[in-house]
Amino acid sequence: MEPIKNLPRLCRTLGYEFKNIDLLTQALTHRSAANKHNERLEFLGDSILSIVISDALYHQFPKATEGDLSRMRATLVRGDTLTLIAKAFKLGDYLFLGPGELKSGGFRRESILADAVEAIIGAIYLDSDLEVCRKLLLHWYAERLAEIQPGVNQKDAKTLLQEYLQGLKKPLPDYQVINIEGDAHDQTFTVECRIDDLSESVIGVASSRRKAEQIAAAQVLELLKK
């Protein structure tokens, strides 16, 4: 996979034009592909995402407790949320992976996709500044920030989908593992989620069956709410 191909199109999708396009290339480069990979950018992006979301929640919910703020932040920055953002950006089409990761479907793996989102955030920060990152992230997260509410528990996607369907008196979703790849210590699970209201199934890919089910459920929820 050629890392530089179609990067202008990705920039348009992200809503940011890089001055130094090499930073974006590095953000999309997995450690299996090159020595100059995205892990340091990922470290930086993780911190920037945390401060931007923390600040947004602090001002959005002036009466929320520290515990509620922490739980909401965890929901917004966790891996399955970042994976959904990556899928919306079609990041898998742009990742630069080594032969082994390509063969095992690394461009679908939730950890690689989530890490790439954080690395892109780090790259944008280095290419601009914190305020530019803040505005962009608030745009990426606008819908999620509008929907999230304080509470004792931030329910996971499977629970939310089940409650949504039950509220409409619809049959519950059916989850099936359709593929398992990789060695026992490094497996990738592909799970299919089917519901009556969608003509086609939705696929989730992750390092565990549970995570793959959560990713599939989250995608179904997004489709149902469109």
From Swiss-Prot:
SUPFAM superfamilies: dsRNA-binding domain-like (SSF54768), RNase III domain-like (SSF69065). It holds the Pfam family Ribonucleas_3_3. It catalyses: Endonucleolytic cleavage to 5'-phosphomonoester. GO terms for cellular component: cytoplasm. Its EC number is 3.1.26.3. PROSITE patterns: DS_RBD (PS50137), RNASE_3_1 (PS00517), RNASE_3_2 (PS50142). Its main location: cytoplasm. Homodimer. This is Ribonuclease 3. It comes from Shewanella sp. (strain ANA-3).
